[in-house]
């Protein structure tokens, strides 16, 4: 399940490739077009180098970059679907692979900020999953909070795929939501700089362990004249151990074999540490069937729209003004 056996398609399961795409320096729409061409070229090259690969993943911001002075401008935004996603779809169809791509998506409501979106395209060239980032990296990211929930789709080798984006992976409830809906391979695409490198590794492992699912995570790599992006693609087993760990190299291709049926079997056969089941059946030895209400106050309050921390009134940062964003809501940064 490590790199030495990851050149061809396994007999069961599938081979995944996560691309540590160099952080793009983007100043114009031509730069975005160049990135798209580079991503498509990389997808075909990866398939040629790893003929058995069935899923190729590109990190957050690989299409449009992180030019914070322009990332909200109409010039930099794309539509989903649109001609750019059609180009990705054609590439997946030609290479006969599933692909995961990052798009900063124009909001259909012109009075609201754009979405940070991920899509999965199948080998027939169809968008089979569209996810809008639920938890933007506040206060620095200006994206509108996602409205599509946490979708799950069928993938290669018996997998059920879900995608989270960067900071989403720090929210354990979101990984649990994906697993609760059947996901057994949780993908994380990110554009993190080195400040949270350790936490990235930790949460990729914990998301796998808490939910008995594989995690496949990949980050941008390289320097954009402001920050260094750490790469470090990571594939974690459903028991929370790291199967493959990338380095900090731009263009590194992190590959690994995934066996979704093994995760499925663990969910069916494990007693001890089957925590996703135990959450809703606590104490099932003493009480047949267990207690179904976990009695967790924050879950009840969140569901009722009353979530509030004991220290919330005293928090210093609760809007984007520290980064110069307006606090009145509505569309800004055009």
Curated annotation (Swiss-Prot):
Any single GO BP term: putrescine biosynthetic process from arginine
Keywords: Hydrolase
Domain CN hydrolase: start-end pairs: 14-260
Coiled-coil region(s): none
Superkingdom of the source species: Bacteria
Pfam families recorded: CN_hydrolase
Top-rank EC class of the record's enzyme: hydrolase
Active site (catalytic residues): 60 (proton acceptor), 133 (proton donor), 166 (nucleophile)
Molecular function as annotated in GO: formamidase activity; N-carbamoylputrescine amidase activity
Reaction equation(s) it catalyzes: formamide + H2O = formate + NH4(+)
Keyword Ubl conjugation: no
Family annotation (InterPro entries): Aliph_Amidase/BUP, C-N_Hydrolase, C-N_Hydrolase_sf, Formamidase
EC number(s) reported in the record: 3.5.1.49
KW Oxidoreductase (keyword) present: no
Record-stated family: Belongs to the carbon-nitrogen hydrolase superfamily. Aliphatic amidase family.
Function: Is an aliphatic amidase with a restricted substrate specificity, as it only hydrolyzes formamide.
Record protein name field: Formamidase
Organism: Helicobacter pylori (strain P12)
């Amino acid at each position: 399940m490590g790199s030495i056996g990851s050149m061809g398609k396994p007999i069961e399961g599938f081979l995944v490739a996560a691309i540590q795409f160099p952080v793009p320096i983007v100043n114009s729409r031509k730069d975005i077009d160049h990135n798209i061409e580079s991503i498509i070229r990389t997808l075909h090259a990866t398939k040629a180098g790893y003929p058995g690969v069935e899923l190729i993943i590109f990190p957050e911001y690989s299409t449009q970059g992180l030019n914070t002075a322009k990332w909200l401008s109409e010039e930099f935004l794309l539509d989903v679907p649109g001609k750019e996603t059609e180009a990705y779809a054609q590439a997946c169809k030609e290479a006969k692979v599933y692909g995961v791509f990052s798009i900063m998506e124009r909001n259909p409501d012109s009075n609201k900020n754009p979405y940070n979106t991920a899509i999965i395209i199948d080998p027939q060239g169809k968008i089979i999953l569209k996810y809008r980032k639920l938890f933007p990296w506040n206060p620095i990211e200006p994206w509108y909070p996602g409205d599509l929930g946490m979708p799950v789709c069928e993938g290669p080798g018996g997998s059920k795929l879900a995608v989270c984006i960067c900071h989403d992976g720090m929210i354990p409830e979101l990984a649990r939501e994906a697993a609760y809906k059947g996901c057994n391979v949780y993908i994380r695409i990110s554009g993190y700089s080195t400040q949270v490198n350790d936490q990235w590794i930790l949460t990729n492992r914990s998301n796998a362990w808490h939910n008995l699912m594989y995690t496949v995570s990949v980050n941008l790599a390289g320097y954009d004249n402001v920050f260094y992006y750490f790469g470090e693609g990571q594939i974690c087993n459903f028991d929370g151990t790291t199967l493959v760990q990338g380095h900090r190299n731009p263009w590194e291709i992190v590959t690994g074999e995934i066996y979704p049926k093994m995760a499925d079997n663990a969910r069916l056969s494990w007693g001890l540490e089957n925590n996703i089941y135990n959450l809703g059946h606590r104490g099932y030895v003493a009480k047949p069937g267990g207690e179904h209400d976990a009695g967790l106050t924050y879950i009840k309050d969140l569901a009722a729209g009353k979530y509030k921390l004991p220290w919330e009134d005293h928090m210093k940062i609760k809007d984007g003004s520290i980064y110069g964003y307006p606090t009145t809501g509505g569309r800004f940064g055009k």
